[in-house]
């Protein structure tokens, strides 16, 4: 429990965004072949930080930076095995090898990011595994954060506290800019007393997520150095 609100260190937040320590969807990631393959641990008894919402945040950052996420393929509900009874990971490695070799052998004039998308194997499908029956089944569906789909039924994704408080799915704001609370922003109706209490709790204001990060930081490039060498160092 944290008894009072606190702010992240301003310089550390800015550096994290500028250096890509907080994942940026453009730059090198724009031309990277991405297979996001994971087991589902959102319902783990003691909780698990590896919630699948984060893969959708990555997808949102790719789309924000590049206008698409066609270089990313998601599969959920996999089993981490190489045997005939549990072939998931072995199959994924074969698909990745095929994808990377096709990119390497592409001698066209397209830039790398376009080559990555153009050479994605047709057999590398997006979907989820239904492990509920005697025979496992791959359900071929685009993976989405919220949808009326079989995969979302099997593997529901849950928002982070920040997303629940109004942040975008990209979840890429470290320190928000503040504005005065407005009771009309909420789905419930406040009494005058409750509105006064809301104002009293958030004396400094609440997040205005539409304004982006308070630092106004922008990604500076890949493999940036923190020094002391001046070579490729953060500005």
Give the label of every model feature segment:
Residues 1-235:
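C-terminal His-loop and adjacent cap/lid subdomain of alpha/beta-hydrolase
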């Amino acid at each position: 429990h944290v008894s009072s609100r606190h702010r992240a260190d301003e310089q550390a937040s800015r550096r994290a965004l500028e250096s890509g320590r907080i994942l940026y969807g453009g730059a090198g990631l724009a031309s990277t072949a991405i297979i996001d393959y994971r087991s589902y641990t959102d319902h783990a008894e003691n909780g698990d930080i590896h919630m699948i919402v984060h893969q959708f945040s990555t997808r949102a950052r790719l789309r924000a930076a590049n206008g698409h996420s066609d270089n990313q393929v998601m599969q959920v509900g996999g089993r981490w095995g190489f045997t005939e009874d549990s072939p998931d990971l072995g199959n994924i490695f074969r698909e990745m090898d095929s994808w990377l070799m096709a990119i390497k052998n592409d001698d066209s004039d397209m830039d790398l990011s376009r080559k990555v998308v153009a050479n994605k194997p047709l057999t590398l499908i997006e979907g989820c595994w239904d492990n509920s029956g005697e025979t496992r089944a791959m359900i071929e569906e685009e993976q989405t954060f919220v949808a009326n789909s079989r995969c979302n039924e099997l593997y529901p994704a849950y928002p982070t506290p920040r997303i629940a408080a109004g942040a975008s799915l990209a979840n890429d704001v470290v320190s928000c800019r503040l504005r005065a609370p407005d009771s009309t922003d909420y789905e419930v109706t406040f009494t005058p007393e409750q509105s006064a209490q809301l104002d009293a709790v958030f004396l400094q204001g609440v997040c205005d997520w539409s304004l982006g990060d308070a630092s106004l930081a922008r990604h500076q490039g890949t493999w940036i150095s923190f020094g002391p060498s001046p070579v490729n160092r953060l500005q």
